[in-house]
């Protein structure tokens, strides 16, 4: 098979969440951070036939970049990567060495609200955390307006940057804090489901 540019982009993003991955049969790839605080899943255009563990995903992606439009074969115990007259044998890693997520869809318990957020708004808040040196982002609601903010929840006098992402809604008031380091997102718009159980689910059709 040949990995599409979209799949390569997904895998590069996954490598920022967990340096390792287990490919499983089918067209869904999943990952989870070593601390088990961030979980992600994506449907790719390719279909994987066998289970394959990769300890260093960034290394695999760098290996693929050695070729122009490489062919990737999932063997019994290794990848065979071919391009032109060149070839690499890349051995799988034991899954016992990899923190991998459960084989089930992400379900948000007791959601408080669902809001559509543009990448422009997400990106502006993430950039604000860097400029203002703030460690977190927050989704908050006063009951009718939902805001996305760059914050420091532990310092009452800290600066704050915020953008309104939804108006005229009806929710219970809430304030959900997310560590900026946990926002491992692709640059696209998202439907965000927020739960008082401490979970935010970012879903995109891209």
Give the ranges of each region predicted by the language model.
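DNA polymerase processivity clamps
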Residues: 1-93, 111-206
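Long, charge-dense
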Residues: 97-115
């Amino acid at each position: 098979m040949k990995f599409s540019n979209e799949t390569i982009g997904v895998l590069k993003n996954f490598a920022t969440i967990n340096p390792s991955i287990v490919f499983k049969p089918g067209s869904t790839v999943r990952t989870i951070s070593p601390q088990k605080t961030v979980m992600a899943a994506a449907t790719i255009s390719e279909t994987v036939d066998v289970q394959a563990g990769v300890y260093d995903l960034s290394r695999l992606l760098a290996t693929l970049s050695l070729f122009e439009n490489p062919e990737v074969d999932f063997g019994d115990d290794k990848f065979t990567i071919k391009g032109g007259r060149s070839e690499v044998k890349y051995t799988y890693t034991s899954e016992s060495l990899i923190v991998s997520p459960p084989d089930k869809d992400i379900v948000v318990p007791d959601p408080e609200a669902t809001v559509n957020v543009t990448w422009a708004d997400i990106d502006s808040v993430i950039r604000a955390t860097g400029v203002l040196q703030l460690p977190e982002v927050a989704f908050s609601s006063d009951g009718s307006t939902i805001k996305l903010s760059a914050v420091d929840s532990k310092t009452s006098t800290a600066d704050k940057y915020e953008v309104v992402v939804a108006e005229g809604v009806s929710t219970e008031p809430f304030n959900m804090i997310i560590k900026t380091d946990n926002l491992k997102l692709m640059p696209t718009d998202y439907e965000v489901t927020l739960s008082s159980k401490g979970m935010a689910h970012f879903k995109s059709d891209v």
